[in-house]
Amino acid sequence: MVSLLSFFLLLLVPIFFLLIFTKKIKESKQNLPPGPAKLPIIGNLHQLQGLLHKCLHDLSKKHGPVMHLRLGFAPMVVISSSEAAEEALKTHDLECCSRPITMASRVFSRNGKDIGFGVYGDEWRELRKLSVREFFSVKKVQSFKYIREEENDLMIKKLKELASKQSPVDLSKILFGLTASIIFRTAFGQSFFDNKHVDQESIKELMFESLSNMTFRFSDFFPTAGLKWFIGFVSGQHKRLYNVFNRVDTFFNHIVDDHHSKKATQDRPDMVDAILDMIDNEQQYASFKLTVDHLKGVLSNIYHAGIDTSAITLIWAMAELVRNPRVMKKAQDEIRTCIGIKQEGRIMEEDLDKLQYLKLVVKETLRLHPAAPLLLPRETMADIKIQGYDIPQKRALLVNAWSIGRDPESWKNPEEFNPERFIDCPVDYKGHSFELLPFGSGRRICPGIAMAIATIELGLLNLLYFFDWNMPEKKKDMDMEEAGDLTVDKKVPLELLPVIRISL
């Protein structure tokens, strides 16, 4: 075994140096973007310790908004300005709308059978159209209005019970429960709080494990076939990745099986029912046949991107409001003046139409705290130029939305939480304005914007209407430290003291 391993390593060494030599000759003839000096073998990996979006932000301040890195053997271009992002996501959208294939993306997308990680092509386009029609369209989002209202009612009842004890509550946990319960009912046709297959804590733990395993693996930085496999095997990354994937897949199998068994008695068919009908009827597209793997791929996208991101945005919004009493008071004054006393005790989504300042608070939260600070990486499908630099074909592109949202060239006092900056400001979060990219832009823009905004705005409205919020007595300052991988949450859970409004 030892001699075989030694032979394998001996074989890889000349291949490794040949690849480096060939790549250096080719790159020397191109006008690549600037970047930090690269070490042999590891490239710039040693400079990316800590939160990746902050490391890249700091490097971009020195090397510019279009920056070239080499992570191991894998070259990457990082974009950190609105102008460069517009060139990549609008001018060259078609040439930049594929995804790099990593070990995690291949496994979790079931070899490209999803809309998050799948490479660009006919199969991806048809699957995205299907997902939008059955779940993400404005009409579908409106049809789920009653679910969002019911789940917010349940959250408020729970908070009132906790508030009566006059002790701090873990608002992070409660808000995760809110967004999870909405997604479980709308997408999966199941209850989050009373799920027979997994308990609440297991679902949350599994999601965070999945998200941490979806990032680049160390083996992805050495894409030579034999070396990539060897690193993944020896480090145990392969084993951990497949272990998490199999647990997620088991959960989705339960969802599919439940829908098959309840098909005849289902009062309100959901997205899973609709896609299962197409599969049973052997729906055939020009380039592929719809399968259960496609369904589970879409379910995985909704599960991983729909629950965590909305909860994180609500958590950051509440943290910023408590830190900024002026903004909190202005938001609550608007809400309580416009809505008045609700005799039936329920907030309706129609109430949001009256609340312009609340919408500004959400915008400002998305600017300062995008739930996914780095947009999912894209891959160029042709040679292009961005800001005058050569970007070769099959080059990974990473857009730092966090950095763009804090760019002093676009935003006055960018570190300040100031919703008023959006008054009479045409910048929006729908992919048309490149100064604000929490959902991305172009062909790869997040299809769940309408669902996310409806969930966030209604949740925030309920929290601010029914309660006043204070810091726990023992805490003087709000800890705003970040933590995470694909998504970035508060490192310390948000604990606040809710006070029920006397007038209600």
Curated annotation (Swiss-Prot):
Cellular location(s): Membrane
Classification via InterPro entries: Cyt_P450, Cyt_P450_CS, Cyt_P450_E_grp-I, Cyt_P450_sf, Cytochrome_P450_71
Broad EC category: oxidoreductase
Binding site for heme: 446
Highest taxon in the source lineage: Eukaryota
SUPFAM superfamilies xref list: Cytochrome P450
EC id: 1.14.-.-
A GO MF term: monooxygenase activity
GO cellular component: membrane
One Pfam family per UniProt: p450
Membrane-crossing residue ranges in chain numbering: 1-21
Names of the cofactor(s): heme
UniProt KW keywords: Heme, Iron, Membrane, Metal-binding, Monooxygenase, Oxidoreductase, Transmembrane, Transmembrane helix
Keyword GTP-binding: no
CDD domains documented for this protein: CYP71-like
Disulfide-bonded cysteines: none
Membrane topology: Single-pass membrane protein
Similarity comment: Belongs to the cytochrome P450 family.
Name of this chain's protein: Cytochrome P450 71B4
Native organism: Arabidopsis thaliana
